[in-house]
Amino acid sequence: MDRSLGWQGSSVPEDRTEAGIKRFLEDTTDDGELSKFVKDFSGNESCHPPEAKTWASRPQVLEPRPQAPDLYDDDLEFRPPSWPQSADNQQYFCAPAPLSPSARPRSPWGKLDPYDSSEDDKEYVGFATLPNQVHRKSVKKGFDFTLMVAGESGLGKSTLVNSLFLTDLYRDRKLLGAEERIMQTVEITKHAVDIEEKGVRLRLTIVDTPGFGDAVNNTECWKPVAEYIDQQFEQYFRDESGLNRKNIQDNRVHCCLYFISPFGHGLRPLDVEFMKALHQRVNIVPILAKADTLTPPEVDRKKRKIREEIEHFGIKIYQFPDCDSDEDEDFKLQDQALKESIPFAVIGSNTVVEARGRRVRGRLYPWGIVEVENPGHCDFVKLRTMLVRTHMQDLKDVTRETHYENYRAQCIQSMTRLVVKERNRNKLTRESGTDFPIPAVPPGTDPETEKLIREKDEELRRMQEILHKIQKQMKETY
């Protein structure tokens, strides 16, 4: 059979092609003839044999390779694997495929699902699931958050807390009369409640300070509040330094909402002293209470005045963290709006009223309705967004990394100084030969008392040295 007949679309016989190739292999061939031959030859489809075209167009079907007589029929553990083989007996080997997207566990992260990666499956390792593991463990453990509210009575602290978390923490509260409040001192009360939302549990602790600023003489009325914060730091420090550190209950105060009266022209001296006494211990968020008693221009002037006085007196309130460069633009705008809203002008209400065909929480007045969750009426929504949705974890981080670490460093320095003093006293006692040790300065002593004790210690040390010299002279004489 003539092979040239099997070359479909061929206009050049095989003998002519072979003769042309032999002729161009000679040195006498010029470039013009070579170019013409290459042009004719490149457009010819006869350069591919029909067997090659048929094999390329045939789909690759994986068939099991025929096995030799199996010597391991009785033992499945040592049976060799059966490798696939193509139809033309051309052997090849394939590595086991990685975990396919359909076989991977699903994630509750939605669009941020690290499993749904556009990369090739061969590049998938699995450490992208670490956020899911942390998320699952954190949700199972739950979260703790301690919020302190401070300010004068009657500024709506309890109402605002109930409005923020949609709870009633003060249902059993007893209001004192005027005579009972005359001799009232600042007390610290705690209200704990467990809140669950979409499977996430939050152990919320509200620390209230009834009696603050209600007396005629409010000198150092913030001391009980500062002592309470230090006590929680001390308790956590002891638990952290103990042997059993697995289940440590975190009662540290993560945020303090300080309520400022809307009446007046700015901060009062009590407000300044309170915030200056606590700004190194807790995150302070100033709140302009009862904003419905002010007109919008008055609210703006009041806010501007409070911010100026906070900067003038060197008060360090909670600072919002800077947004990363890869943050969403909407989040950046929201964060900027929160920064500009300090102090938050809020209105609290647990009463549901009807406004324009809707049932909303607000306050009903003869001239209209003030809606608590209306951004045009107050900053309640912004405060809730900052406190619960966007910056709750940052408040806890600042408490742990800044305020608690400062307290912990002070405790370690105090303990180190006491140890050094005790060693020096023991060394002096051994050298002097006396049996009565010099007492140490008790912790928590005020500076004047500590200075007096130190002077007495120096005087006693000089007396011991004189006594030691006299004893030495008497031994040498006799």
Curated annotation (Swiss-Prot):
Lineage top rank: taxon: Eukaryota
GO biological process: cell division; flagellated sperm motility; hematopoietic stem cell homeostasis; neuron migration; spermatid differentiation
Modified residues (Phosphothreonine): T434
Chain spans, region G4 motif: 289-292
GO cellular component: axon; cytoplasm; dendrite; perikaryon; septin complex; sperm annulus; synapse; transport vesicle
Residues carrying Phosphoserine: S117, S118, S325, S432
Species this protein is from: Macaca fascicularis (Crab-eating macaque)
One Pfam family per UniProt: Septin
Protein name stated in the entry: Septin-4
Coiled coil start-end: 446-478
Cited function: Filament-forming cytoskeletal GTPase. Pro-apoptotic protein involved in LGR5-positive intestinal stem cell and Paneth cell expansion in the intestines, via its interaction with XIAP. May also play a role in the regulation of cell fate in the intestine. Positive regulator of apoptosis involved in hematopoietic stem cell homeostasis; via its interaction with XIAP. Negative regulator of repair and hair follicle regeneration in response to injury, due to inhibition of hair follicle stem cell proliferation, potentially via its interaction with XIAP.
Post-translational modification: Ubiquitinated by AREL1.
Compositionally biased residues, Low complexity: 95-108
Molecular functions (GO terms): GTP binding
Entries under PANTHER family matching the protein: SEPTIN
Binding-site residues, GTP: 151-158, 185, 290-298, 348, 363
Stored CDD domains: CDC_Septin
Cystine pairings recorded for this chain: none
UniProt keyword Nucleotide-binding, yes or no: yes
Region (Disordered): 40-74, 87-115, 428-448
Region (G3 motif): 208-211
Keyword GTP-binding included in the entry's annotation: yes
Positions of the Septin-type G domain: 141-414
